[in-house]
Amino acid sequence: GANLLKIHDGGYVPVMIATAFTVIMWTWRRGTAILMEKTRHTDIPLSSFVSSIERKSDHSPAHVPGTAIFLTSDPESAPAALLHNLKHNHVLHDKNVILTIRTINKPRVAQEDRYTVEKVSDRFSRVELRFGFMESQNVSQALATLRKTGLKFDIMSTSFYLGRRKLVPDAKSGMPHWQDRLYIALANAATDPSDYFRLPANRVVELGSHVII
């Protein structure tokens, strides 16, 4: 009873703030789950993609010098930016790196635990970089240490490919329309990956796609 009286004396303000934060967090988690579920239906396993693309045929893409790094959250699937680049530009770089960046539940990561490198084929490698939650995620600097593994490339002749999704609300998404709009607004307000990961601005290529959520 005493706590109810405090609501009339301004106690409703922290209650409203807490409710707003709860709605925002729940919307973000729910919207992200829906988005991942929808994109999963169109994903192509990376191993299958590499096998098909490296099979010699009259339709093989042209090869260009240099290294292409494709950022993705799912290292098991061919990144959307890679697929769009092939579709529109019909080229494949000499070296292609599928890069995943993880933030782990530690303040900092020891240098020997910073990365793992997996060779998928002569042209494709899969790399995972790990950062602690207190570290600045300087990807260009971290990639320079990969030379120890034999994965050598000149950062200034390397192109970073990012997939950018334009989200479109769907009445059948599983969330109310206002929540669709809130999720899209939150996604649009997120930090630009090229800035967050400190990628050289003149080496970044963004390829967009429409996704209905």
UniProtKB/Swiss-Prot annotation:
Q: Which Pfam families match?
A: K_trans, K_trans_C
Q: Would the keyword Cell membrane be found if you checked this record's keyword annotation?
A: yes
| Name under which the protein is recorded | Probable potassium transport system protein Kup
Q: How does it sit in the membrane?
A: Multi-pass membrane protein
- Cellular component aspect of the GO annotation: plasma membrane
Q: What are the protein's UniProt keywords?
A: Cell inner membrane, Cell membrane, Ion transport, Membrane, Potassium, Potassium transport, Symport, Transmembrane, Transmembrane helix, Transport
Q: What is its main location?
A: membrane
What's its job? Answer: Transport of potassium into the cell. Likely operates as a K(+):H(+) symporter.
Record has Cell membrane as a keyword: yes
What this protein catalyses is: K(+)(in) + H(+)(in) = K(+)(out) + H(+)(out)
Q: Which family does it belong to?
A: Belongs to the HAK/KUP transporter (TC 2.A.72) family.
Q: Molecular function (GO) terms listed?
A: potassium ion transmembrane transporter activity; symporter activity
Annotated membrane-spanning segments are: 10-28
